[in-house]
C-alpha cells in the first residue's frame, strides 16, 4: 500500500526536486538550507488501513542550538519531573526531546483551505490527508487527491521557509532566532505571547532564562 501511494506522486515530487527516502519521506533541501519533508504515514490495523499525510520543515543547524538550550532546561534543578519517574525514564525523555530537527510540522491540512472556502467544501474535495479505508477502491479520486496534496504541500513549504515566518509562528525556534539577532523587544513580545498560552509555563520560563544566560 505504501509503495502504491508514493508511486502515485513520485513524478510530481521529483519534478519539484524531491527524492524519496526510507520509502515514505519525500525530501528536498531548499536554497535556505532547510529541508522540506512530506511524509506518507500508513498502517494497517484489524484489516483496514489508516493514512495520515504530514509535512515538516527541518533545520538541523537551528535546532541544534535550540536543543542545546532545551537540554539545559530539562536538566535544571528547577524543572520538575513526576516523582514516580526513575532516572532512566528522565534520561530517555531528555534524549527524545533534544534529538529532533523539526522546526515546524503540519498535521492538520484543514488550515490550508482557501480563504473563502468552507470546511465542508474543503473536506469534500480533499480528505485523504487523514483517512481510514479497507481498500483504495473506496476512495475513487485518491490519485487526484494525492496530486492536490503535492500542490498544497509546495505552497506550505514556500510560506514557512523564512526566518520571518519561523519567528512569528513557532515557539522555541522563534525565541532562539530573535535572541540570536539581538531583537530584544521582539523577543520579549514573542515570549510573553507564548507564555500566556504555554501548556508548560515552567518550561517556557526556564527556556527564556537559559536563552538569556547563553546570550550573556
Predicted regions and their residues:
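Intrinsically disordered, low-complexity regulatory regions enriched in serine/threonine/proline
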Residues: 1-6, 27-216
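Amphipathic alpha-helical segments
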Residues: 1-21
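A short acidic/basic microdomain associated with nuclease active sites
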Residues: 17-31
Amino acid at each position: 500500500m505504501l509503495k502504491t501511494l508514493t508511486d502515485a506522486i513520485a513524478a510530481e515530487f521529483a519534478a519539484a526536486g524531491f527524492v524519496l527516502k526510507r520509502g515514505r519521506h519525500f525530501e528536498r533541501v531548499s536554497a535556505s538550507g532547510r529541508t522540506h519533508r512530506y511524509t506518507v504515514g500508513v498502517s494497517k490495523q484489524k484489516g483496514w488501513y489508516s493514512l495520515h499525510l504530514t509535512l515538516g520543515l527541518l533545520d538541523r543547524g537551528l535546532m541544534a542550538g535550540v536543543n542545546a538550550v532545551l537540554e539545559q532546561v530539562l536538566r535544571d534543578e528547577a524543572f520538575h519531573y513526576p516523582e514516580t519517574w526513575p532516572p532512566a525514564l528522565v534520561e530517555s525523555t531528555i534524549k527524545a526531546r533534544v534529538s529532533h530537527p523539526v522546526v515546524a510540522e503540519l498535521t492538520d491540512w484543514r488550515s490550508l483551505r482557501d480563504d473563502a472556502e468552507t470546511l465542508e467544501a474543503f473536506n469534500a474535495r480533499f480528505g485523504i490527508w487523514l483517512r481510514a479505508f479497507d481498500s483504495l477502491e473506496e476512495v475513487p479520486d485518491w490519485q487526484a487527491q494525492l496530486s492536490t496534496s503535492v500542490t498544497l504541500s509546495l505552497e506550505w513549504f514556500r510560506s514557512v521557509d523564512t526566518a520571518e515566518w519561523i519567528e512569528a509562528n513557532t515557539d522555541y525556534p522563534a525565541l532562539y532566532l530573535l535572541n540570536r539577532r539581538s531583537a530584544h523587544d521582539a523577543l520579549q513580545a514573542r515570549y510573553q505571547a507564548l507564555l500566556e498560552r504555554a501548556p508548560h509555563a515552567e518550561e517556557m520560563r526556564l527556556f527564556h532564562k537559559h536563552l538569556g544566560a547563553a546570550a550573556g
